[in-house]
Curated annotation (Swiss-Prot):
Interacts with pds5 and swi6. The lineage of its organism: Eukaryota, Fungi, Dikarya, Ascomycota, Taphrinomycotina. It is found in: Cytoplasm; Chromosome. It is an enzyme of class 2 (transferase). This is Serine/threonine-protein kinase haspin homolog hrk1.
Length: 488
């Protein structure tokens, strides 16, 4: 097929049809970590926030952090990678599959990068002799790629294109029970397309992690062939209504490969979801924090690409009685004394008014049984050269922290993305100044945590020593969650 020279658009969200199906604004973005500031003097700052109920949040000049957020040189990244390529990372991994977060983590055994053919321990991986396609087929339990058109005919009753990203098309398909399922269709293997390592990483981590807060994976299928006419019709309809930045997929040859991920429809991405209150903003942050803490503990998980296109939101499934009780009959002053129905964690139940789902694990890192890990090697220089959005500064921060050691576990990368998330909630969702004590307190919490985990204040880069020092006691999503629960 004709080579596509399109530049990757990491983190640049695409347009959607309407608010009902504005989901997954950026499903194919490319995914990057820190160390520990003493937690002091926040009470005075919080009281100051409460006194200025009608004041608007100041616009942060995040892109002016020159010494910290300087664009990374790709050659520098290459040198760092070469410097560490012969080292065996001191990675902490689970000794066996994790069913709950209470199990302890033990020292590593054999560490295997499933998106590479080399075991980090120096021993060949079990599937290292397989070419990338057959390794992917092995993971999804297929002997060969299925004909694309045959797969579509066997699966769908109704289908509609609802979005796109640089490397994929997103469709909503209804199954036999009329339950909506999202298809993420990823052409891969050719120039200008997703690479095998990217697809392997996302598929493997999606299969490993089965927790609330991650989209339920129904099926992964590798297919081959020209683009089915049914999907082309939907592609054209979407183009007429919304435009498209992707090439029309009719140019794909009969040998073109695709990976199709079939997942639950989990809501609207945060960029397009309309938040109506500071309480809802707090709910988005707190639910995201809890999810990250859980998977950090169970799987040594780092998302490494948690921009607001990869956070899906929908209203929490609650009965009318629960909603009435939580939102109408109590105030924040009552939280510590009220007996909440059906929950032993009062604060969690009160804050859980929205349901959050994290998606897109292309750049993520996770551990599984017997020392096996999956991660992305961040080989694309474009990832570290983005401008005009705090998201791109986070990639550079992660690069400074990891120094090319992407296999290792740096949970503070999750804290970096939580700082980005609070920035988006405070400054990009256009909420009005709070007018009630409850709303003021919710915004005050976010601003307090924003200061607490500010990487400019908590990280000290020692350029001469080529090292990083941290002054913070918050070094992971788990430690931040513990702090939040103790504080509030």
């Amino acid at each position: 097929m004709e080579s596509r020279s399109k530049v990757k658009t990491y983190g640049k969200n695409r347009r959607y049809i309407n608010k009902d199906i504005e989901i997954w604004a950026s499903l194919d973005e490319r995914p990057c970590a820190l160390k520990p500031r003493n937690i002091e003097n926040f009470n005075n700052q919080e009281r100051s926030d409460l006194e200025h109920i009608h004041s608007k949040p100041k616009k942060d000049s995040l892109l002016s952090w020159n010494i910290l957020l300087k664009k990374g040189s790709y050659k520098e990244n290459e040198l760092l990678a070469k410097r560490n390529q012969n080292l065996v990372p001191t990675v902490i991994i689970p000794a066996s599959p994790r069913d709950n977060a209470s199990k302890s983590v033990v020292s590593k055994k054999e560490v295997v990068n499933l998106s590479s053919s080399v075991a980090l321990s120096g021993k060949p991986a079990n599937n290292s002799k397989l070419d990338p396609l057959h390794r992917l087929l092995q993971i999804v339990a297929q002997e060969d790629a299925l004909p694309f058109s045959q797969f579509v005919k066997s699966q769908t009753f109704e289908i509609q294109k609802i979005g796109e990203a640089s490397y994929s098309e997103v469709y909503q398909a209804s199954n036999a029970d009329d339950v909506p399922v999202v298809w993420k269709v990823i052409p891969f293997g050719e120039d200008g397309q997703a690479q095998y390592a990217d697809v392997l990483n996302e598929v493997q981590i999606s299969q490993w992690i089965k927790v609330d807060g991650f989209a339920n994976l129904h099926q992964v299928v590798v297919v081959k062939g020209t683009y089915p006419s049914l999907l082309l019709e939907e592609w054209d309809r979407y183009l007429m209504q919304n435009g498209s930045e992707n090439d029309r997929p009719d140019s794909y040859s009969s040998t073109q490969l695709y990976c199709v991920l079939c997942l639950d429809h989990s809501g609207t991405d945060l960029e397009h979801f309309e938040l109506r209150s500071w309480r809802e903003c707090w709910s988005v942050f707190y639910e995201t924090l809890k999810i990250l803490s859980l998977v950090e503990t169970r799987y040594e998980f780092e998302h490494r690409d948690l921009h607001w296109g990869n956070i899906l939101i929908r209203k929490a499934d609650r009965s009318e009685e629960e909603v009435s009780f939580l939102l109408n009959e109590i105030s924040l002053d009552d939280i510590e004394s009220v007996d909440f129905p059906g929950s032993q964690d009062k604060a969690d139940d009160f804050d859980n008014i929205l349901q959050v789902t994290l998606i897109d694990f292309t750049l993520a890192r996770a551990s599984y049984s017997q020392g096996i890990i999956s991660y992305n090697e961040f080989n694309d220089p474009d990832l570290f050269n983005g401008v005009d959005d705090y998201q791109f500064d986070i990639y550079r921060l992660m690069s400074r922290v990891t120094k090319g050691r992407w296999a290792q576990f740096f949970p503070i990368t999750n804290v970096l993305w939580l700082h980005y998330l609070i920035h988006q909630l405070l400054h990009k969702k256009n909420l009005s100044s709070p007018l009630t004590e409850t709303e003021t307190l919710m915004r005050s919490r976010l601003k307090q945590i924003f200061r607490l985990i500010d990487p400019v204040k908590t990280m000290q880069f020692q350029q001469a020593e080529d090292s990083i020092r941290s002054k913070s006691t918050v070094t992971s999503a788990t430690s931040l969650l513990n702090w939040v629960r103790q504080k509030y």
